[in-house]
């Protein structure tokens, strides 16, 4: 069994992406006897679905967790729901934009994660890691990835979800405007703790509605 951890490459003005750094840092580690496989996703609508579907089919992980950066957020924010919707004012790394199309024309309008995100938020805060629940993963690549992750995890009766993180401090310090941030070490600890918590409680979470 494995844990599949997706991060994203840099995009738009953000020349470093903490989700990539977290996935790389945790790649090859072991959490509760499960090996973590970190995979970096391109910020391209036309590529991420095939990559996510292929990796989940190949690895059949017990948990697939996506991570993305949410510039402007100050806390780690586990996401509750992914919506079947693509909209972007800015293009992806290939210049592609969408104006309200569905991710999956045959899919549900929204899919809830089967990760206990409410309890996860409490756990992170209790361990000194600022966290809050998010009810919107947006409409850009993170929401797109989350929708596919949850959809595919259902096929294997496994766990799937998504967590947004702030910008990391070392990069935020180089941006010429005020912006919330968090230390990379704290975010790595937060994601590791999240995976431990999810795996510990996995039996209660393997139900879908």
Curated annotation (Swiss-Prot):
Pfam families: Peptidase_C15 (PF01470). It comes from the Archaea. One of its GO terms (biological process) is proteolysis. The active site is at residues 79, 142, 164. Its EC number is 3.4.19.3. It is an enzyme of class 3 (hydrolase). It catalyses: Release of an N-terminal pyroglutamyl group from a polypeptide, the second amino acid generally not being Pro. It is found in: Cytoplasm. CDD domains: Peptidase_C15 (cd00501). One of its GO terms (cellular component) is cytosol. GO terms for molecular function: pyroglutamyl-peptidase activity. Its main location: cytoplasm. Keywords: Cytoplasm, Hydrolase, Protease, Thiol protease. Belongs to the peptidase C15 family. Homotetramer. PANTHER family: PROTEASE FAMILY C15 PYROGLUTAMYL-PEPTIDASE I-RELATED, PYROGLUTAMYL-PEPTIDASE I. Removes 5-oxoproline from various penultimate amino acid residues except L-proline. This is Pyrrolidone-carboxylate peptidase. It comes from Saccharolobus islandicus (strain Y.G.57.14 / Yellowstone #1) (Sulfolobus islandicus).
